[in-house]
Amino acid sequence: MLQTYTATTRPADGPPRLHALRAALSAQGVQGYLVPRADVYQGEYVAPCDERLAWLTGFTGSAGFCIVLPDRAGLFVDGRYRVQARMQCAADFTPVNWPETKPAAWLREACPNGAVIGFDPWLHTPDEVETLEKGLKDSGITLKRLPNQIDALWTDRPGPPMGQVTAHPEDLAGLSSEEKRRQIAQALADAGQSATVLTQPESLCWLLNIRGADLPRLPVVQAFGILHADGRVDLFAHEAKFDGLVLDEGVHLRPPEAFEPALRTLNGPVRRTLNGPVRLDKTSLPLRVLNILRETGAEVAFMQDPCLLPKARKTEAELAGARAAHLRDGAAMVEFLCWLDTKAAQLVAEPEHVLTEIDIARQLEAMRGRSNELVDLSFDTIAGSGPNGAIVHYRVTEDSNRRLLPGDLMLVDSGGQYRDGTTDITRTIAIGPAGALEAECFTLVLQGMIAISRARFPRGVAGGHLDALARYPLWLAGRDYDHGTGHGVGAFLSVHEGPQRLSRVSTVPLAEGMILSNEPGYYLEGRFGIRIENLIATRKGEVPEGGDARDWLEFETLTLAPIDRRLILKDRLSREERAWLDAYHARVQTLLTPLVSPEAGQWLERACAPL
């Protein structure tokens, strides 16, 4: 099995580690320290050796940070993780609502004038540090760069990952690495830039048509790179990871320790490789990289990572791969949902029957594995029953594993990594008869999901413009959810990909080929969680009859699996909403029936019957 269920942290471990950290800070004459979740690559997924926040606090969520002071430790988490943080962390760590509470404001209130706060410049971006310093202006509180303080205390810290790198075939990528490098290099040259420093492994893997095995759930190699305006690439990674793999001409593999010296030769008075500034993305770059370049007198230009938008706009080959992956994944989901319905009926008839969250996660992984094409999960399966469903990113462990009960809602958010695509799907399933409140909230969430699915919009519209469509039915009922409506999704890369999002803060215009999730939800702490998620691909839309001859866009739904009709209040749906759902279910049945067992096919026919 790919997913394990042993708890990796214990609340009791936090207080003695916090005490040791405070002693180390006191010895260095600093009054505080920043402990981020991020590693040097600033990604969502980190290797076990980089789980510093979890080691200190016990919190295992994918986003957050801790500010340690002599008399308090604030754990900053967003709305997805507030319940989880309270469950995983000792009382020595105080959850702080973020981003509602800004770190600078918290420090101003908590620290005396003259306090010095330490941080590791490899683990924070220039954007983060500039924002914090601006917020602390005139407070008397200063930031100080320090060697990593957690690493000095973590005596049994695991070693760095050494997964093998493989080629990603051009027939799946749609473009050769040479074509991609030429395209990005030309953009640099057109902007008068000499090079760009690439610090996000997903960008490098996309650019070079390679995939790695350094991280669970994310098929990347941990590496840094420098792309020059003439198309050359210096790739800084351990040679042992590339055993037997021949890189393209113009791609030079160099050891990780050569990265800093290479930065010092990029563009400065001492030596210039090419004329023009070095392009840096200060939202994802380690601050230390910028510091090194400034030490050499290099000229820099702050712009977005030039690989992000081309990577987000999938080629026709990548879209075809995504459709194939979703057919395969949809068949696995149907087999799983058929199995779960059978088990749920048995549970209702025989209350002594035992069915747990781990049973569900294991069964779903087994169903996906039957295709023999599953490389990995795209994230640890979220299998939250009853009150655990209200923990947005709940990860079941042997300690938290809950027995399902009749009347529960079962929220299952899962996905697979296949060589031709990445999937992410959420279904909320009734375990026996559901309550009136559960059905009402499910219907509101469904209406929001359908609104995004049916959206037609002119070119130039961003995800921030569409986010409210998914929330509006909930808003009318005085309800909402504390996460974005959707995130970008990669092509056998990260299940969470930018820069596009369906979120009220997103300003990135949507464009053809962008794949996003569509996943509104509703969570009632202590009771239940509801989320319905499909992946959608942005495509060119038809001009409505009698409409303006504008450049319209719309969404193609990629995900294929029934939505639990037992939780739908049919009379609450409009005629258009019912028509969309019936058409979606008809398509699901047509495409998946040939791919599933006879038993699952019969179940699918019932699950997809018109409302």
Sequence positions of predicted segments:
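Active-site neighborhoods and metal-handling regions in enzymes and metal-associated proteins
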Residues: M1-L611
